[in-house]
């Protein structure tokens, strides 16, 4: 199934929805860290990009990436369960990866819950490699699997 949605930079009016989606989709069972103030901080940060995916006017996905000197870090990527496996996550990730390459950054890193096998399969399917495990990464409760992708291939292929 192909995503029929628009990806765009998040607006101030999206902050609450992004924070809520993070709490439901990513931070379930944890003390919420991605409160509206933190999302807004990343929206204002010149080294971060906050994207949303909309199905007409409804927010169906979001992603937050922070760019550093030699790499980028995918902080969050979430898609509403009813729209998962429809290409929205790939669409958001493609936008961010293209932005990274355009900015001269060719390495993207992320962490995902060790128990989140669906997310691990998704990231592997788009070229991410597992590079290690961080015990207790999620507030001492859950381990994280570190993953990364070298984007040099995107530069070489032109996208």
What are these regions, as identified by a protein language model?
Residues 107, 113, 147-150, 155:
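Conserved catalytic core of the tyrosine transesterase superfamily
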Residues 109-111, 124, 129-146:
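Conserved catalytic-core motifs of GNAT/GCN5-like acyltransferases
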């Amino acid at each position: 199934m192909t995503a029929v949605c628009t990806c765009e930079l998040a607006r101030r009016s999206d902050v609450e929805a992004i924070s809520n989606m993070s709490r439901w989709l990513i931070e379930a069972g944890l003390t919420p860290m991605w409160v509206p103030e933190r999302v807004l901080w990343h929206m204002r940060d010149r080294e971060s990009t906050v994207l949303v995916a909309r199905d007409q006017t409804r927010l169906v996905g979001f992603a937050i990436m922070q760019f550093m000197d030699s790499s980028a870090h995918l902080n969050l990527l979430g898609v509403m369960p009813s729209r998962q496996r429809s290409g929205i996550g790939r669409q958001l990730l493609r936008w961010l990866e293209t932005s990274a390459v355009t900015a001269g950054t060719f390495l993207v890193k992320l962490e995902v819950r060790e128990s989140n096998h669906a997310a691990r399969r998704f990231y592997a399917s788009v070229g991410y490699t597992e590079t290690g495990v961080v015990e207790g990464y999620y507030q001492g409760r859950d381990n994280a699997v570190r993953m990364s992708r070298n984007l040099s291939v995107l530069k070489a292929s032109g996208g």
